[in-house]
A protein has these predicted regions:
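Conserved alpha/beta core of the MobA/IspD/sugar-nucleotide pyrophosphorylase nucleotidyltransferase superfamily
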Residues: 149-191
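Nucleotide and nucleotide-moiety/phosphate-recognizing core
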Residues: 1-131, 139, 163-170
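Short, glycine-/small-residue-rich phosphate/pyrophosphate-handling segment
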Residues: 130-131, 135-161
Length: 191
């Protein structure tokens, strides 16, 4: 079973307030929209949140999004990803999405998931030559994912296993559009 991981444990330092709570589509918060898009394709998803964000945790749970609280989220994206992966050891693959990227099309998520039949597969979407999210990892990478740390997520795995990375060209600008500042939010097509 493919496991969706929604990384929602950041601290929104560049935004100035909790960007993941900002309303976008029909008033739904950014993180909820991103989670819904992931869930549209993957029945099993898990959102990882930081221990200081009870409001986001509650909001996700109210929208039937399972959460896990990463006690050391301040160590960075890698630590949060490792925490979530270690909580889902039964998965056959992990599709890792970012909660500040609500524009990814479900068809792109499905394509990434479909490329992970081989346990050694790694899949990344590419739009106009730019690699984006979500990123998918087959079962063979469980140990490496579960030991990540720092603020660069799974970048080291993508470099170390470059020969295994499938670059899936897609017509989805959402894979490279994240919301880091209020200006990014204002220019989001969903607003």
């Amino acid at each position: 079973m493919n496991q969706g991981i929604l990384l929602a444990a950041g601290f929104s330092r560049r935004f100035g307030s909790n960007k993941l709570l900002q309303p976008i589509t029909d008033g739904a918060p950014l993180a909820v929209v991103a989670a819904r898009r992931l869930r549209a394709v993957l029945p099993e998803i898990l959102a990882v949140v930081n221990p200081h964000d009870a409001v986001l945790a509650r909001l996700l749970e109210q929208n039937d999004i399972p959460i896990t609280v990463c006690p050391h989220a301040q160590k960075g994206m890698g630590a949060s990803l490792a925490w979530a992966v270690s909580r889902t050891p039964q998965a056959s693959a992990w599709i890792i999405a970012l909660a500040d990227m609500p524009l990814i099309q479900p068809a792109t998520i499905a394509r990434i998931a479909g490329a992970l039949c081989d346990p050694t597969a790694i899949a990344v979407p590419v739009f106009q030559g730019r690699r984006g999210h979500p990123v998918g990892f087959g079962r063979a990478y469980f140990e490496e994912l579960a030991q990540l740390n720092g603020d660069h997520g799974a970048q080291s795995l993508l470099r170390h296993h470059a020969e295994r990375v499938q670059r899936l060209v897609c017509n989805d600008p959402g894979i490279v559009m994240d919301i880091d500042t209020p200006a990014d939010l204002d220019s989001t097509p969903l607003n």
